[in-house]
Amino acid sequence: MQPIILAPDAYLRAVTLRDLTDPAQGPHALQRVVQVITAALQTRWQCAIREHRAHPVVPLEHNYDRLHYPPEGAARDARYTRYVSETTVLRTQTSAMIPSLLRQIAQQPPRDILLVCPGLVYRRDQIDRLHTGEPHQLDLWRIAAQPLGHAELHEMIATVVDALLPGAEYRCNAVAHPYTVDGLEIEVRAGSEWVEIGECGLALPAILEEAGLPVSRYSGLAMGLGLDRLLMLVKQLQDIRALRSTDPRVAGQMLDLELYHPVSQQPAIRRDLSLAVATTRTAEELGDRVRQALGPRVQSLESVAVIAETPSEDVAPEARARIGMGPGQKNVLLRIVIRDLVRTLTSEEANELRDEVYLALHEGSAWQWAGSRGQSV
């Protein structure tokens, strides 16, 4: 299957988006998160540290093959991955930096080193208060000329959680990763919810061998953390959009790890949309389409949620006609919650946003507008 190549304007927006973990692009609290984690692990292990950054456009091979993803795996699908060309992608994980970095350190094999790889990653994801299409991740790989096993892995988990969230309750669930053995998902309790902050496991021996680090001498631990989620927990933020806010009252609080003080509580405006879309469309794909259509104005959307999906054959004929549903389509009831972080939107502004979302997603032949666009049709 031919991949869907990213449009030039979407590519430009992606590669010029500020990486909040990079001090060269200005200070941000996410940098403090990286510093605190790195310092805690270095103190625990007394190991060397190597921080590494790389351009977000990577060969497909680095993002998947070298990490032992199966050739026909679903993760490679253009529904989840943003292709720059047939052979390059915007990295979906900071783990894409690891195989090449392992080859570099194999030239002068370490006794004990922690690889620290922060940066932006790019997903096609849903829109809500916890998700963004461009989250920040941190890969941490400890490589040592000694056996590293489950005890060291759990020590790593405890050190990271205690460094940022002292006393927090956390749990680990078994999960499979192609580049680890005995993988785990890490969740932290936040009130009545469990929030995933990352995944980890023992480094896959084959990856070390392929990099020139024989497993007869070397072993490794691998961990990937969601930095945005961690910062939200530390500062008790309720909305991920605050991390990129340009309002001085919000941005000024994104420079440290102190608790966040809400600027204001804007009222939520809800709009429900009845859409005809291809039967293969996913919630993540719909969210990504909205981001591409609205650009920076997506910051005014708190969430975009699929409420119901109905196959064409189960939709009443009059309803099919009303939305112009055709063959190979399904009816999606979508709820958008419009709430700007710093100002109250007018009903007219909310309707215009609703219509732009509708225009980006609806694939039927009949249209139902809410704002002035409908008056001009």
What are these regions (language model features)?
Residues 21-26, 138-150, 271-279, 346:
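Short histidine-centered catalytic/ligand-binding loop motif
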Residues 41-48, 109, 161-169, 293-304, ...:
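Short secondary-structure junctions
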Residues 47-62, 170-177, 302-306:
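Long, charged, glycine-rich C-terminal linkers/tails
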Residues 150-155, 159-184:
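Extended C-terminal subregions enriched in glycine
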Residues 1-131, 142-143, 194, 199-208, ...:
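Class II aminoacyl-tRNA synthetase-like tRNA-binding/catalytic domains
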Residues 30-44, 152-165, 285-294:
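Amphipathic alpha-helical segments
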Residues 178-190, 194-377:
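A carboxyl-terminal module marker
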Residues 140-141, 145-146, 162, 230-232, ...:
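Long, well-ordered mid-to-C-terminal structural blocks that present hydrophobic/aromatic surfaces
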